[in-house]
């Protein structure tokens, strides 16, 4: 009887531990789902901003083939201002970091789910590493931007962000494009350096878009997997 009592107590303790672990895994999963949802929103914004950067790089290259005076100088100055775009993607990593640092990965018994979580973290690290390089090149571009555009124009344009170009009215753009602007022909050396650097930025943003898309797909898969595994709404 004593053996049976001890055995039953052991079973009860195992069940209790299992229930506690399941509860903790479920609570962590709720936070992870929210983090991944926030990440997908941030990824969409980043992809849109990168798309605008890529497009205006093409505009600058096209304008550079013209005589950079009057309207062409104004347009070139306008787009040049937005070449300094170094806003990072704010990943939501606190929950997963807490899970790792507290040894709570053991609560997640689904190996495929764990594998996806680790794959997502590796992909985020890869994206962040490249964006660190993007920021370094962006800071190098700032010196060239300052050499090329007029400080007053720079000040007026600083009220607008890269993403706002997508919704900026034609009237507002036309005001900038028709603003009195000095010839940029005497700044061709700085312009050449700027264009070469922006082409590098453009190329890497195009390449990084693939990583962002993979991260978005994986985040959505994890949201669905976590909801299914832990019966979340």
What are these regions (language model features)?
Residues 1-19:
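Membrane-embedded hydrophobic alpha-helical segments
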Residues 14-233:
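Long, hydrophobic alpha-helical segments that serve as membrane-spanning/inserting helices
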């Amino acid at each position: 009887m004593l053996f049976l009592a001890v055995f039953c107590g052991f079973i009860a303790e195992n069940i209790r531990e299992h229930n506690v672990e399941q509860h903790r895994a479920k609570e962590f999963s709720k936070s992870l789902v929210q983090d991944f949802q926030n990440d997908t929103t941030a990824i969409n914004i980043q992809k849109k901003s990168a798309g605008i950067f890529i497009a205006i790089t093409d505009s600058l290259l096209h304008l550079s083939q013209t005589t950079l005076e009057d309207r062409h100088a104004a347009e070139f100055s306008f787009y040049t201002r937005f070449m300094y775009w170094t806003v990072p993607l704010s990943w939501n990593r606190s929950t997963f970091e807490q899970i790792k640092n507290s040894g709570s990965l053991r609560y997640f018994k689904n190996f495929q789910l764990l594998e996806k979580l680790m794959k997502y973290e590796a992909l985020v690290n890869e994206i962040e590493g490249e964006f660190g390089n993007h920021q370094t090149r962006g800071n190098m571009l700032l010196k060239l931007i300052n050499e090329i555009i007029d400080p007053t124009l720079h000040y007026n344009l600083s009220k607008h962000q890269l993403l706002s170009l997508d919704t900026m009215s034609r009237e507002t753009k036309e005001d900038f494009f028709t603003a009195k602007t000095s010839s940029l022909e005497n700044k061709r050396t700085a312009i050449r350096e700027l264009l070469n650097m922006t082409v590098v930025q453009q190329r890497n943003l195009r390449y990084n878009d693939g990583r962002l898309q993979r991260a978005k797909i994986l985040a959505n898969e994890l949201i669905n997997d976590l909801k299914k595994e832990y019966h979340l709404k």
